[in-house]
Amino acid sequence: MLEYGIIEPAASPWASNVVLVKKKDGSLRFCVDYRRLNSITYKDSYPLPLIHNCLNALSDSSWYSTLDLRSGYYNIPIAESDRDKSAFITRQGCFRFMVMPFGLTCAPSVFQRLMDVVLCRLSYQACLVYLDDIIVFGKACNEQLTRLGEVFSR
């Protein structure tokens, strides 16, 4: 993460602990325990899509493509003045995120809002966005390909 500009060395009084969580495939997922930080963080109440609205939008389509914006949160920079709050401790030292990490209480709302802005005119008409997953849908193959192109061009 250091070499990709996701984290940087830090000296921060906010440092949280790292937790390694075992995934279904046996590999480990790097997580930071932000419970203390989250307990004092302003909660962003931006709404996530409702399932019945999603099902209604998809109901007339026959073609579907799913896109997973893997590491999508890492495309949202953290303000320099807030980076120390994202700090964590490892055996190699203290680091802080330069981009939005998973685990922050407001991260899902921030990301959903961004995706809704980026795909605003396509949402519920050509695609559905739920956090870092996008479903592009269409009634016919040509329509589906056109809609995929529209999503990719954003």
Predicted regions mapped to residue ranges:
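Retroelement reverse transcriptase polymerase core
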Residues: 1-154
